[in-house]
């Protein structure tokens, strides 16, 4: 099924500007509460000016340009401005430090970076060290340092016309983006994403939550992340809806923002749901317009039920990863839901559970979740300059090995068990970290938890739990281990406990387990 045809992102924005004109496309709210509005026509003009800015800096079709930005309108301008001239955006996780950021610049062969004032000193140091291809920094900020190799984003953009100066031929198969995976367990890999991928994501994700042009899709997810781009932004823009981008997530501000913008759809990760539940209950908890809350793994049954009961919302399960572009398994519009299932495959995809010999397993048996799609269209195209990693993950016939363990039932509902790399091998038994985390999260004194395996000379691996307590609470090791012994099999009970003030997370909310080992 080809639902994109010959369309690319330049054509998309020209069409949207003509169809929706003065309708609000983008609303941005900063941490300071400042709000900016852009219509479809005005946003397209900003995108064109930004495309011309890059052209003036020597960027041409096929060139890579990095972005290291917090959520801001300029991210949207750059993302689509680069696509319009056939250049390739390389978003960098806004929480990465110098060595990690330099590694991405080096491995993506990127010479031009757009960043903002808080990150400038780090990149100036990288630039001066000369260990990466970085030769020019385009700075978004109130002032411009008088330094060579640095230009001011808004000064350059103000000099540009709002009609494109450079329009090279584009096809849907052209690369639009290299999005590096979060690298929570190892070095990140660059996921190559095409114009077709992004156009398809818009159609698919808008179908997934039955999005219409009168909807308002609000997100606090980071703009450099696949969820913000393909589940939220592309979905909203593809149907002419309004996309509300919040600079940073605040549990105290979230519901006020939902009400302020009359949001009808949003997306949440477990960390958000847990912190929202820690807020003092209010009489207006259910006073909102939300129709759907897109939800990503993992929540316990108790957490899910408590959240839906308190706020009067439906959690709409969506399972995917950077390589799948969208949530390829999930709850479908108008279809029944079966918690704790992650749902059923969406259109254009097939899914199977396979064993270690790569053979399909029958219902009820746990194996690897594998997805069939079309590389460069409904799945990522490849890993950037990593043919070895591409061949390991993606079969020639389009089957993607997710690395996740799961099973399916007789009706085709799929169930997520854990990341294969997130299983602890303990004395011959495979133990799911997610299973233990969901149980431990049920302790009334615990706010957050992560479980990892650590080396054990006798039993291969021992289990260690890191927990964050609710404010003002104390917890003894005896109480913790007693709770575990009462709620899980003996071989699953952690051997070690560490109480921390917080857990290391990346901008998408995933815990960085390698920082705990």
UniProtKB/Swiss-Prot annotation:
Pathways involved: Amine and polyamine metabolism; carnitine metabolism
GO biological process: carnitine metabolic process; fatty acid metabolic process
Keywords, comma-separated and alphabetical: Ligase
CDD domains per UniProt: FACL_DitJ_like
EC number: 6.2.1.48
Reactions catalysed: 4-(trimethylamino)butanoate + ATP + CoA = 4-(trimethylamino)butanoyl-CoA + AMP + diphosphate; crotonobetaine + ATP + CoA = crotonobetainyl-CoA + AMP + diphosphate; (R)-carnitine + ATP + CoA = (R)-carnitinyl-CoA + AMP + diphosphate
A Pfam entry, by short name: AMP-binding_C
Gene3D superfamilies: 3.30.300.30, N-terminal domain of ligase-like
GO molecular function: carnitine-CoA ligase activity; crotonobetaine-CoA ligase activity; medium-chain fatty acid-CoA ligase activity
Family the entry assigns: Belongs to the ATP-dependent AMP-binding enzyme family.
Matching HAMAP family: CaiC
Function recorded in the entry: Catalyzes the transfer of CoA to carnitine, generating the initial carnitinyl-CoA needed for the CaiB reaction cycle. Also has activity toward crotonobetaine and gamma-butyrobetaine.
Protein name: Crotonobetaine/carnitine--CoA ligase
Species of origin: Salmonella arizonae (strain ATCC BAA-731 / CDC346-86 / RSK2980)
């Amino acid at each position: 099924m080809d639902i994109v045809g010959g369309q690319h992102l330049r054509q998309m924005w020209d069409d949207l500007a003509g169809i929706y004109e003065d309708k609000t496309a983008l609303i941005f709210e900063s941490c300071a509460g400042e709000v900016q509005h852009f219509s479809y026509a005005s946003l397209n003009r900003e995108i064109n000016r930004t495309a011309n800015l890059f052209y003036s800096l020597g960027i041409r079709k096929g060139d890579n340009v990095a972005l290291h930005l917090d959520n801001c309108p300029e991210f949207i301008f750059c993302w689509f401005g680069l696509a319009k001239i056939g250049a390739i955006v390389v978003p960098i996780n806004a929480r990465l430090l110098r060595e990690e950021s330099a590694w991405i610049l080096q491995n993506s062969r990127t010479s031009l970076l757009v960043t903002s004032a808080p990150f400038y000193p780090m990149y100036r140091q990288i630039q001066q060290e000369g260990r990466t291809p970085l030769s020019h920094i385009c700075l978004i900020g109130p002032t411009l340092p008088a330094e060579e190799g640095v230009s001011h984003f808004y000064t350059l953009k103000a000099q540009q016309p709002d009609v494109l100066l450079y329009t090279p031929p584009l096809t849907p198969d052209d690369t639009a983006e290299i999005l590096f995976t979060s690298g929570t367990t190892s070095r990140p890999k660059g996921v190559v994403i095409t114009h077709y991928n992004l156009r398809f994501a818009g159609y698919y994700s808008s179908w997934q939550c039955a999005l219409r042009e009168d909807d308002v899709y609000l997100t606090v997810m980071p703009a450099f992340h696949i969820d913000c781009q393909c589940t939220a932004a592309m979905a909203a823009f593809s149907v002419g809806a309004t996309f509300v981008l919040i600079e940073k997530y605040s549990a105290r501000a979230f519901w006020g923002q939902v009400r302020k913008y009359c949001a009808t759809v949003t997306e949440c990760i477990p960390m958000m749901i847990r912190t929202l539940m820690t807020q003092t209950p209010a009489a207006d908890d259910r006073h909102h317009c939300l129709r759907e809350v897109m939800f990503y793994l993992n929540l316990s049954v108790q957490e899910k039920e408590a959240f839906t009961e308190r706020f009067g919302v439906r959690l709409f399960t969506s399972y995917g990863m950077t390589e799948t572009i969208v949530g390829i398994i999930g709850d479908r519009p108008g279809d029944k839901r079966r918690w704790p299932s992650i749902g059923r495959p969406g259109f254009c995809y097939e899914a199977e559970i396979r064993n270690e010999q790569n053979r399909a397993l029958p219902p009820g048996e746990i194996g690897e979740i594998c997805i069939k799609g079309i590389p460069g269209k409904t799945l990522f195209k490849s890993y950037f300059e990593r043919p070895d990693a591409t061949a390991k993950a993606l079969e020639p016939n389009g089957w993607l090995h997710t690395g996740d363990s799961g099973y399916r039932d007789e009706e085709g509902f799929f169930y997520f068990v854990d990341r294969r790399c997130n299983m602890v091998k303990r004395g011959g038994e495979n133990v799911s970290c997610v299973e233990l985390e969901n149980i431990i999260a049920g302790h009334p004194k615990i706010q957050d938890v992560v479980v990892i395996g650590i080396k054990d000379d006798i039993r291969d691996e021992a289990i260690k739990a890191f927990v964050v307590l609710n404010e003002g609470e104390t917890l003894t090791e005896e109480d913790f281990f007693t709770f575990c012994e009462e709620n899980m099999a003996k071989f699953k009970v952690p051997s070690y406990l560490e109480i921390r003030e917080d857990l290391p997370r990346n901008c998408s909310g995933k815990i960085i387990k390698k920082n705990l080992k």
